[in-house]
From Swiss-Prot:
Residues 10-25, 70-110, 117-164, 171-205, 231-245, 823-834 have a biased composition (Basic and acidic residues). A motif (DEAD box) lies at residues 570-573. This is ATP-dependent RNA helicase ddx23. Keywords: ATP-binding, Cytoplasm, Helicase, Hydrolase, mRNA processing, mRNA splicing, Nucleotide-binding, Nucleus. Probable ATP-dependent RNA helicase which may be involved in mRNA splicing. ATP binds at residues 457-464. Its EC number is 3.6.4.13. It comes from Dictyostelium discoideum. It catalyses: ATP + H2O = ADP + phosphate + H(+). Residues 42-54 have a biased composition (Polar residues). It is found in: Cytoplasm; Nucleus. Its main location: cytoplasm. Residues 1-245, 322-371, 813-834 are annotated as: Disordered. The gene is helB2.
Length: 834
């Protein structure tokens, strides 16, 4: 067995270590002063009364201090107590051993055994080993300690055997077992002290107590023996230090509750103590919605006076002839009691007058409420300058206006607040437009900024006026046309899908343009192209045309668009459906591309604000947004602002829809006769899918003695114009038409629309019934449907359900109404290819 390696410590290191130990008590007092109680902080007799807790904490780190074992004075005192306990225990063991030796000698003499002889042999061997170790140079002290340990083990083993043969052995053995766990580390530490010969105490006290002559301070070098139990000793010191640190922190935490909140926060932040962030949140606190406005802008107060001003009642205990009240009682405690009686009395006397409400008076109604019933904080009772962002948001919600595509200017509330030119306001007054429609409210201010617009609005929403007014304002800012500039073409161009719609837009535009002195020319089929070319050659500011005739004029060089930078596409979805996409594309390509804005949104925004240069403005209006229209808008519109009024393709709620399931054409005639006789009074529009069906309906109307006219593509342009004009002037009570009259034809006062032949798609159905219920009036739409009309059944059922109209039982249970036509696949059928 190799002897353990020796570690030598020089005298200089020992001296340096002693100096550190002398400074240690001062540091201990300093750090303990940091955690003194509040009375010490407030004591005016201290040496440093001006020092605050923050200044002391800045100089000393408590965690670093405790990790380095700075509190050795307390540990030393605890060691002294352990050493005193060890001395007392050693004396008790010696007395016990002496008494036990005498007992063993007595037992041996009495013939009890040879225990005493073994003790004498063991003591003799121990003395011999000790003499040999000292003679060899003191290096055998480790073996001496090992022998002592083995000797103690043998002694306890002998005691166990001896106790097993004597009285009370089980009691003493149980006590040793109970005390064994408590004696483990303490006995080992005491043996460490004995092995080190008081080394631990001398290092801290600078005194050599309990050592041999070789450990005196006169020697230049001294020996530091290595022990296998040093790890246990270090672990215990570390554990004691950690426990002491926790006690100090517990004292700090207890004192934190009594301290000033500011000082507590300073301590917590400096010492890195984590706050209790896992606070139990109140139910509903996490997802609680917080409004962006304060309570002063709240417009959600009840409109009913019974809730805004509570009725305070003093009970009369059954007295009174009107619900417990006396009508002549003037008791001030009962508010409104006289008014309740008087109001009910007046209501009973004037029942007929109160029931006749004028629903067409839209000027006094907002969101289904009378303006007088609205609170004072409502936007309708605020001046324009007092409107907040929230007010504009509510304004758009009231009129079902939504925009996207960047920041859009605020809509106009009234014509008086619009700041439009005097000529426009005069034309509006003459035409009798009391207030703008939702599409006009939002479209006009956006168009005046020069932005492109993609407008989606229901039929009969006033889209014509929405693009005519900004178009005229744009032209008014351009130089007047001369004989030299007239050859370069018009300033503005409007395209519509049908002749009737073109003529209607022309009439509407002339009503406004005459106040500016602008000239308007229409180009439609069915008329002489030479006569139209002659009108264009004389010069005009605005051209309104169908795509086909306009493209013919461009190809024959009757017209050029060199200075046309304002273009409107009305009813774009219908133009695409009628197959005018090539003509529309050809016309747009004929316009100068140098005036087209950049495709980059940032650059296009800068170009819109540049008033020194003219850029093209494109406005596209449509009732629906099919893929082809969306493709067209992406190609020719730059940074457009999308305006949606209501929902795309949605039927207005003012139209009541009825669907009649019929079995044959004869059933249609019978139901048509009944609708003409028992239905709303004229004017009435009857739609058919084929021109020959007009001849089928004519005899039925003659039997009902109703005047009628026919409008379809097979008639000449003069006949079509005469038919439409006669129907508008009430010369004819019924108009029989094909799909040409379903888009954009506005006839005032149409009360009833009858679909003798229901269309194949829901879009055409929407536009047909949109001829009634215009300008805020109510309307009725009746449709005949057969088993062959499977293409529209699913969509028709959906639109009837969404508008709270009655769905006939035949349509509700029909297989084609359960899923969209063309989307089902019969998986039960198998196809075998040969």
């Amino acid at each position: 067995m190799d002897p353990p390696k020796l570690t030598f410590i020089s005298k200089r290191d020992t001296k340096k270590k002693d100096e550190v130990n002398k400074e240690q008590p001062t540091k201990n007092l300093k750090i303990l002063d940091l955690f003194s109680n509040d009375e010490e902080f407030s004591n005016p007799t201290q040496e440093e009364p001006t020092n605050t807790l923050q200044e002391k904490l800045m100089n000393v780190d408590p965690l670093e201090f405790f990790s380095k074992g700075g509190l050795k004075e307390e540990q030393k005192k605890e060691r002294d107590d352990h050493r005193d306990d060890y001395r007392d225990s050693r004396d008790r063991d010696r007395d016990y051993r002496d008494n036990g030796g005498r007992d063993r000698d007595r037992d041996y003499r009495d013939g009890g055994g040879g225990g005493g002889g073994r003790d004498r042999d063991r003591n003799r061997d121990r003395d011999r080993d000790r003499d040999r170790d000292y003679r060899d140079g003191g290096g055998g002290r480790d073996r001496y300690r090992d022998n002592d340990r083995y000797r103690d083990t043998d002694r306890y083993r002998d005691n166990d055997r001896r106790d097993g043969s004597g009285s009370g052995s089980s009691r003493r053995r149980d006590e040793r077992r109970e005390n064994s766990g408590r004696r483990d580390y303490r006995d080992n530490d005491r043996r460490d002290d004995r092995r080190d010969n008081g080394r631990y105490g001398r290092d801290n006290d600078n005194s050599g107590g309990g050592g041999s002559g070789k450990n005196s301070s006169d020697k230049k070098e001294e020996i530091n023996p290595v022990s296998n139990n040093n790890d246990i000793h270090k672990d215990r010191i570390k554990r004691d230090t950690t426990q002491f640190s926790h006690k100090v922190f517990e004292q700090i935490n207890n004192k934190r509750d009594r301290e000033d909140p500011e000082l507590r926060d300073i301590k917590v932040d400096y010492m890195g103590i984590k706050r209790d962030e896992n606070r139990k949140k109140i139910k509903g606190e996490k997802g609680k919605f917080v409004f962006e406005w304060d309570s002063s802008e709240d417009t959600s107060s009840d409109y009913n006076t019974l809730y805004t001003k509570k009725l305070e009642i003093q009970p009369q205990f059954g007295h009174g002839n009107f619900g417990g009240y006396e009508k002549n009682n003037n008791n001030n405690g009962n508010h409104y009691n006289g008014n309740i009686y008087n109001n009910n009395n007046n209501n009973n006397n004037n029942n007929n007058n109160n029931n006749n409400i004028n629903n067409n008076n839209n000027g006094s109604m907002i969101g289904g409420k009378q303006i007088s019933e609205l609170p004072d904080t409502h936007w309708s009772k605020k001046p324009l300058k007092s409107m907040t962002k929230r007010d504009w948001h509510i304004f758009k919600e009231d009129f079902n206006i939504s925009t996207k595509g960047g920041i859009a200017p605020n809509p106009i509330r009234t014509w008086q607040e619009s700041n439009l030119p005097r000529e426009i306001l005069e034309a509006i007054r003459q035409l009798g437009y009391e207030k703008p429609s939702p599409i006009q409210m939002q479209s006009i201010p956006i168009s005046l900024t020069g932005r492109d617009i993609l407008g989606i609005a229901e039929t009969g929403s006033g889209k014509t006026c929405a693009f005519v007014i900004p178009m005229l304002i744009y032209i008014s800012k351009q130089p007047r046309l001369t004989k030299d500039t007239e050859a370069d073409g018009p300033y503005a161009l409007v395209m519509a899908p049908t002749r009737e719609l073109v003529q209607q837009i022309e009439k509407e535009t002339r009503n406004f343009a005459q106040h500016f002195g602008f000239r308007v020319v229409s180009l439609v089929g069915g008329q002489s192209i030479e006569d139209q070319a002659y009108q264009v050659s004389k010069g005009c500011e605005i051209i309104i045309a169908t795509p086909g005739r306009l493209n013919d004029c461009l190809e024959k060089r009757y017209l050029v668009l060199n200075q046309c930078n304002y273009i409107v596409l009305d009813e774009a979805d219908m133009m695409i459906d009628l197959g005018f996409e090539p003509q529309v594309t050809s016309v747009l390509d004929a316009m100068p591309s140098s005036f087209l804005k950049s495709e980059d949104d940032e650059m296009a925004e800068k170009q819109e604000s540049d008033r020194s240069h003219i850029y093209r403005t494109t406005i596209l209006f449509s009732a629906t947004m099919p893929p082809l229209v969306e493709k067209l808008s992406k190609k020719y519109l730059r940074r457009p602002c999308t305006i949606t009024i209501g929902e795309a393709g949605k039927v207005v709620d003012r139209i009541r829809q009825t669907v009649i399931f019929v079995k044959s054409e004869n059933d249609k005639k019978e139901h048509l006769t009944q609708l003409i006789k028992d239905g709303p009074p004229p004017p009435i529009i009857i739609f058919v899918n084929k021109k020959k069906h007009c001849d089928i309906i004519a005899p039925v109307l003659e039997e009902c003695r109703v005047s009628y006219t026919i409008l379809h593509s097979g008639r000449s342009q003069e006949q079509r114009e005469a038919a439409l004009e006669g129907f508008k002037k009430r010369k004819y009570e019924v108009l029989i038409a094909t799909g040409v009259a379903s888009r954009g034809i506005h006839v005032d006062g149409v009360t009833h629309v009858i679909n003798f032949d229901i269309p194949k798609n829901i879009e055409d159905y929407t536009h047909r019934i949109g001829r009634t219920g215009r300008a805020g009036s109510a309307g009725l739409a009746s449709s005949f449907i057969t088993d062959k009309d499977v293409e529209i059944m699913y969509d028709l059922k959906q639109i009837l359900t969404s508008t709270n109209n009655i769905v006939p039982i035949e349509l509700l249970k029909h297989p084609s109404s359960q899923q969209k036509h063309g989307s089902s696949k019969d998986h039960n059928k198998s196809v075998i290819f040969k």
